[in-house]
C-alpha cells in the first residue's frame, strides 16, 4: 500500500456504510482480466465491499490446476485418489435438509471418489443422494503439497493469521462435488470476505447485497434455505419476498476466482463436476462488519434468555458462553484476536530493515509485501474498533480475568507505532 492510498482510505473506512442499491438493478460484476495494482483492488473492491471476478490467468500456474485436472478439463480422480486415499474428509448430503443445512459425515477420501465415479457413470445420479465434499482443511493437513498460492489481493488475512497463531483452526477449504451439488443460502462465517477459485468445472452463484437477506426470512425470522424454492411465493410465510431485489447471477468458469464481499448472502451450484479452493478472510476493511455481527449475535442470545436475567448472577457471562458456542467466538476472544493482529504489526513496524529479504516466514513475507503503510492502516482500524468496544456496555461487563492484557496499554502502543509512519 502506498502513502496516498493509506491517507485516502483511512478517512473512507470511518464513513457510514452505504446500501448497495446499485447492485439491485445490475446483473454483472466487474471482471479483472490481468494483474492490477493492489491499491486499486483495495480502493475499488475491499473498501466499498464490492464483488468482482478474476480471470483464469491468476491461477494458471497453480500446481492443482496442473495435477488435479485431466487434459479434458475434468477432475483427475485417479491422481486425487493416489494423493489422498484413506484421508478422512467431511462430506455433505445435498439431498437432505437438516436444520436449514445439509447433514455431514466423515468418510475415507477413496470412498467419496468411488461414489463420484459411480455417480458420473449413472448420469450424475446415485441412491446415496447428492454428496459434496466440502469444508475440507486440505491445506492445513497437507501443507507440503503446495498446490496453490494465495493472490496478493487476498493476503491481508487476519482470520487465518490469528487461527494459525493459536494453532487451533483455519478457514482455508477445498470443495469437490459432482454436477448438481450445491450450497444452500447463507453468509460466510463472522460475515467475512471469501474468495473461491474454480480448479475445474463451473459454478453458478446467486449473490444478494447486504440487507436483502431480511426480505428472505420466513414469518419466524428464519433465513430461506433455497431462494429459488416455490415456497417463497407464499406470502403467509415469506411476507417480504417480493421486496427483495433479483440476485446477481454469476457463472464462474474453470480457473476463475470470485471475490465475495463481506455480508453478501449467496447460494451456489456446481453446473459440472467441480473442484474449488475457498478462503474465508477478513481485515481492517471489514472489521467493523464483524464487530457489528458479534453485537447482533449477542443481542440475539440475550433476547432468548431474557427471562433469567434477574435471577442469574452470571447472566451476562452465560450469554458470552452461549454466543461462543453458536458463533465460535466471544467478546474476550475477539479482543485477543485484535491484540494478536496489532502485536504482529507493531513488531513489523519496529523491525529493521522492513524488506522482503529479511522476512523469515509467511506472515512476515505478507506484511513486507503489503508494506508499512498497510500495517499502519491495520493498526488504525484495530484502534478504532477497540475504542468503540471500550465504550460498549457488554464489553465493560467482561470479567477482567478473561482478558490476558490491558486494552488501554495496547492502545497506547498502537498510537506510538502509528506515529512512526504517519
Swiss-Prot record:
InterPro entries: Cupin_8, JmjC_dom, JMJD6_ArgDemeth/LysHydrox. Its cofactor is Fe(2+). Gene3D superfamilies: Cupin (2.60.120.650). GO terms for molecular function: 2-oxoglutarate-dependent dioxygenase activity; metal ion binding; peptidyl-lysine 4-dioxygenase activity; sequence-specific DNA binding. It catalyses: L-lysyl-[protein] + 2-oxoglutarate + O2 = 4-hydroxy-L-lysyl-[protein] + succinate + CO2. Its EC number is 1.14.11.-. GO terms for biological process: positive regulation of translational termination; protein hydroxylation. It is found in: Cytoplasm. Signal peptide: none annotated. Keywords: Cytoplasm, Dioxygenase, Iron, Metal-binding, Oxidoreductase. Residues 139-298 form the JmjC domain. Fe cation binds at residues 186, 188, 266. It holds the Pfam family Cupin_8. GO terms for cellular component: cytoplasm; nucleus. Belongs to the JMJD6 family. Catalyzes the 2-oxoglutarate and iron-dependent C4-lysyl hydroxylation of ETF1 at 'Lys-63' thereby promoting the translational termination efficiency of ETF1. This is 2-oxoglutarate and iron-dependent oxygenase JMJD4. It comes from Danio rerio. The lineage of its organism: Eukaryota, Metazoa, Chordata, Craniata, Vertebrata.
